[in-house]
């Protein structure tokens, strides 16, 4: 049953032109813009560095805000003088292992150091607070803190830190819904700045894929090429909206916070950014790991119920670094083929996958390309191929892509495959990506969730079914143009003698004009 989420936090595209997030107010956007500008004027101009430094300070404030909230509750119960058993900031002194000095725990708290003089604040944050949150990884306070060991504090001027702290202080870190939207807005600024955009999949495409797959509260969801955790975060929003009452139960809430979401990446910056993105959306301890998903580090098999991903597809790997179980299925160096093989391995029976792939996966003629498509059609249940226009990833890339949706069955269960030819996604397909009226996304979701109504569609329509046997007969090609019928208008031309007569008349007019010109001007 399709869940149309219309609670104001996650409005589906059924409610209008495209998926719309309720978003943040103009006031908060202005606050974030001012924080961003403070970094730039302070000499930090690389957008991913800005995001990282902002993330560190978010974490500092989150830790203090959380403890302040716990302390307020304890005080109401008459236990204000008793130290909280799980307090991050304890009573007494913290020994800084980097400076070998003892520092009062209270000085490490946002609510304290924000009132220091600029120079005192700068020294405290740079030498003490930053080192404190780096060493929190020893206690595994959160998924985020586990990836702080190689973090670097880049703010170089006290006045820059003061401006940023003042800006962040106006944000309520305990309001996870708003903070999740704030972080999404910051990620959007990172992409809009024109650098590091390769890390960011288009959010409206991610939201479409989440709507297509309809995550369930019982799912174990993974993105083996996590990046900023876009697929996982959009899944959290869907689940929170769809299962609001069920999440009040302790067991469900625990699964949501700890066991439901997994993500892997090799870049420490992405691990920190992705973990913070999840934390700000209420997932404090996801299974986020620093690992190469295609290597022998990753031994997961038959575990996840849902995988959604946009894996890297521009590179090749040496056989030596690829997991043997993947090469046994698909002997190739191409990452896009290896990741698809990996997804099959990591899913449990009945598990589902939606992945973005380059078009070459659909029609490549190498042995590995054909073997992968054969595996999907003959040994799994391939459900849908959604072909997307090449401009979807602009301005960062112009490659044509598609979404592949399948269920792991390990048996021949593909009867027919649904194809959709997306022509518009709500934005212009040039580098500017301006918002436009044309948008196929609502139609895609509506049709995918009502496939029984697609049986009458013809190859001349924008979506249609293709029998599995026809795909086998065409070397397992999944290119939509292989099966789509293009209706061409019959063009009726005039008879040859009529056309020749026009040429003769035109030639006579040209000769007449030339003679007139010579008579007037060339005597």
Q: Each predicted region: which residue ranges?
A:
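Conserved S-adenosyl-L-methionine
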Residues: 195-309, 314-318, 324-325, 333, ...
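C-terminal, active-site-flanking charged/polar segments
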Residues: 381-382, 394-444
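Hydrophobic alpha-helix feature that most strongly marks membrane-spanning transmembrane helices
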Residues: 279, 312, 348-352, 362, ...
């Amino acid at each position: 049953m399709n869940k149309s989420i219309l609670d104001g936090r996650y409005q589906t595209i059924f409610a209008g032109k495209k998926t719309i997030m309720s978003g943040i107010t103009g006031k908060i956007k202005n606050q974030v813009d001012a924080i961003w500008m403070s970094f730039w004027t302070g000499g930090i101009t690389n957008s991913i560095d800005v995001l990282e430094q902002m993330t560190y300070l978010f974490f500092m404030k989150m830790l203090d805000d959380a403890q302040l909230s716990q302390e307020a509750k304890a005080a109401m119960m008459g236990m204000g003088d008793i130290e909280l058993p799980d307090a991050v900031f304890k009573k007494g002194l913290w020994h800084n292992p980097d400076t070998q000095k003892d520092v009062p725990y209270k000085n490490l708290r946002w609510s304290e150091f924000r009132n220091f003089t600029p120079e005192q604040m700068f020294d405290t944050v740079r030498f003490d607070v930053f080192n404190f949150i780096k060493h929190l990884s020893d206690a595994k306070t959160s998924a985020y803190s586990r990836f702080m060991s190689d973090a670097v504090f880049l703010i170089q001027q006290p006045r820059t830190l003061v401006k940023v702290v003042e800006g962040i202080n106006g944000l309520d870190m305990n309001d996870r819904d708003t903070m999740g939207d704030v972080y999404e807005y910051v990620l959007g600024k990172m992409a809009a700045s024109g650098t590091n955009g390769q890390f960011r999949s288009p959010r409206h495409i991610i939201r479409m894929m989440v709507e297509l797959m309809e995550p369930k509260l019982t799912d174990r969801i993974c993105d083996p090429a996590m990046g900023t955790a876009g697929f996982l975060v959009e899944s959290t929003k869907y689940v929170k909206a769809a299962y609001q009452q069920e999440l009040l139960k302790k067991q469900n809430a625990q699964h949501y916070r700890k066991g439901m979401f997994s993500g892997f990446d090799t870049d420490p910056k992405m691990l920190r950014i992705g973990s913070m993105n999840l934390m700000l959306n209420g997932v404090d301890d996801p299974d986020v790991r620093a690992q190469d998903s295609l290597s022998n580090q990753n031994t997961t098999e038959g575990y996840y119920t849902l995988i959604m991903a946009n894996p890297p597809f521009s590179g090749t790997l040496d056989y030596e670094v690829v997991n043997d179980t993947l090469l046994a299925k698909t002997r190739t160096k191409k990452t896009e083929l290896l990741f698809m093989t990996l997804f099959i391995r990591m899913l449990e029976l009945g598990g589902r996958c939606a992945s973005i792939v380059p078009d070459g996966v659909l029609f490549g003629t190498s042995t590995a390309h054909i073997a992968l498509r054969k595996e999907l059609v003959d040994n799994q249940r391939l459900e849908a191929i959604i072909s997307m226009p090449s401009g979807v990833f602009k301005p960062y890339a112009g490659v044509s892509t598609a979404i592949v949706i399948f269920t792991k069955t390990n048996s021949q269960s593909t009867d027919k495959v649904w194809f959709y030819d997306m022509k518009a996604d709500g934005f212009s397909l040039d580098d500017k990506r301006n918002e436009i009226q044309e948008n196929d996304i609502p139609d895609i979701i509506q049709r995918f969730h009502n496939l029984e109504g697609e049986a009458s569609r013809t190859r001349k329509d924008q979506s249609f079914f293709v029998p599995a046997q026809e795909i086998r007969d065409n070397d397992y090609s999944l290119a939509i143009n292989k099966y789509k019928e293009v209706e061409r208008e019959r063009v009726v031309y005039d008879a040859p003698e009529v056309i020749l007569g026009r040429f003769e008349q035109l030639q006579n007019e040209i000769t007449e004009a030339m003679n007139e010109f010579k008579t007037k001007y060339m005597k």
